[in-house]
């Protein structure tokens, strides 16, 4: 049986994100000239602390926040102990009389201190309760651990504080008003002065992101490839998603940083996991470790459950009293945050996208209120409100009514009932357009299953979107159930996937010079992980197992290039971005738009625009979203997609961050007529955009540009997927330990590169290499990205990345027997399957 070598290898120089000639560079600095920040060993932790200090708005805010977290834990434990052991509830509930005077017949007013037990009685009751003593001892040990960790972190963050002041020259008072891009630019400049990393002369933006997001990128890839057990089919409820903070913590503990994890340190995978010869033994070892951690979770379940209940009660009781409808609000689920996250996307960037999509997402979910539920809510509000009105009127007439037993309780419950019922009654003046709302949501969240488009009005789409955008009450309930469910998921669902996880980390881990071991998906290389239906046809050599799903590679690459305009992408990424820009220019030229504005004003445009803020970039998105249904007669669905694609392309083509009254000067003027990427790249060095306000404006326009690109790329993907719907469908099978090969692809040859369908209004297709427009447009991208000479597909030799790796994914009609290479015997009884991925 043919077998392949899956030996982990060092990343090639063209993939290392290093300047030529610096791949094995070791910078030497004289002893007397070393700065305090020369050769920082753990750059992952250092850059993460730099980022955290920026996000927490400086050292003082971070210090006070950490102190309050310690105080919160003490308060919850102490207050709960006091309520259990030091309160006489018979007096509090008036079941026992209290006499303060010498005359028992005189009426006595009970005060709150009367219900408190004396200190001696309270102490005796605590000592008699063995369970309470055990819980207090465990809580005390945990609090002391947090206190020691707090002191250590303060010492470390004081060093980061000094780094901001002396190396980056950013005072703490100005830090809350500095964007992360400004801080990152100063870090890149500081590398040249202090040699923070001695393995590279210069740091890039991608290096910093890789250091901060090393483990997060692995988690995003694991969710993208459906390797983590997060979806379950429940009897009577159908498919459900369960992903909580406790479950995520256990995943990270097992895989990344816990004792016996897969990583030797923050930046290096253990050597045995880089070789395929012991994969079965390593999988068994991982399975046993998951079992023991699951058992530990089961034993600690009572304590964790008590803590979860108490913390949720103290956190949400006041909110529920003040705003009863708060639990009816929605939030982005933890699974949704991981599914929607780009590779190399920091937490504040993700949060900004999701915040922009929150209002349209809420309005979309409100479109599906049940008519029966609305009818019941209206009548329930009527009956409860009538009784409440009578009680309030009686109270106004005579306040002694409140002294009647349970009157105040009844008033409170009736008020909560009325508030809850009103939350299920839709606004009678609101007009809902589910398809338009879903398109607005897509513009911000960037990811969406293909079958949602055109089916926004269906309950199935609503239910699937609810997995990403869940009720706050459901979120709290899942967190409360997490201590019980997490051990079951670890023992019975995660353990059977141990072999697939081992294969995943071996096949998709690469070593980057000056960075260490990273997830290969985080390199955003369309050649190795691109999807042919996401504009990568002819530019990717990835098998179905190697390609990222839902266009994650392509959209992540576009997002990172727009967010970091100074980044120089690799050759293949530059070719992809150039091809996308060329397609945008062609589709934009095909759209006939009115002079003086993108789209005319109309009622639907105004209603869609009301979903957004008043800023100009978001209004541009509203124009594009409303355009396809506001102008012209109804068209068939395929022609509507072409028209919509042309409109988005026109918006991108004319997109410019300059306000109408500003006059561009110099080099910026010549680039503003191109895509937004070029415009912002040129303007980032211009005096027009200097200052903090200009940085925020550029960030807003970058977000809008990415939203337009997401709409455009999804439309292209939809049309290309319709052309070949079954070619790139993949599924995950159980790990094959027998080494059997995949189905033979014998007769199928290499696929020819396919061109992306053009707009329906585009008259004809000129050959790409000879088109003068292509040459001119690509010249701008050459100046922007360091350039290539040919805008077409980059010629390359056949790569070992075209092989189909382990893990059980198989491409329809294809075999796994490509480029057979024998594996030398290692004396191991583990047998490798013939589908491998060599990095």
Curated annotation (Swiss-Prot):
Intramembrane features from the record: 291-301, 320-328, 471-480, 484-492
Record family assignment: Belongs to the ATG9 family.
Annotated consequence of substituting residue 412 to W: Does not affect lipid scramblase activity. Strongly reduced autophagy
PANTHER family on file: APG9 AUTOPHAGY 9, AUTOPHAGY-RELATED PROTEIN 9A
Major subcellular location class: membrane
Keyword Mitochondrion: yes
Protein name per the record: Autophagy-related protein 9A
GO biological process: autophagosome assembly; bone morphogenesis; innate immune response; mitophagy; negative regulation of interferon-beta production; negative regulation of macrophage cytokine production; piecemeal microautophagy of the nucleus; programmed necrotic cell death
Subunit structure and binding partners: Homotrimer; forms a homotrimer with a central pore that forms a path between the two membrane leaflets. Interacts (via cytoplasmic its C-terminus) with ATG2A. Interacts with SUPT20H. Interacts (via the tyrosine-based sorting signal motif) with AP4M1; promoting association with the AP-4 complex. Interacts with ARFIP1 and ARFIP2. Interacts with PI4K2A and PI4KB. Interacts with ATG4A; the interaction is direct and promotes ATG9A trafficking.
Function: Phospholipid scramblase involved in autophagy by mediating autophagosomal membrane expansion. Cycles between the preautophagosomal structure/phagophore assembly site (PAS) and the cytoplasmic vesicle pool and supplies membrane for the growing autophagosome. Lipid scramblase activity plays a key role in preautophagosomal structure/phagophore assembly by distributing the phospholipids that arrive through ATG2 (ATG2A or ATG2B) from the cytoplasmic to the luminal leaflet of the bilayer, thereby driving autophagosomal membrane expansion.
Glycosylation site residues: 99
Membrane association type: Multi-pass membrane protein
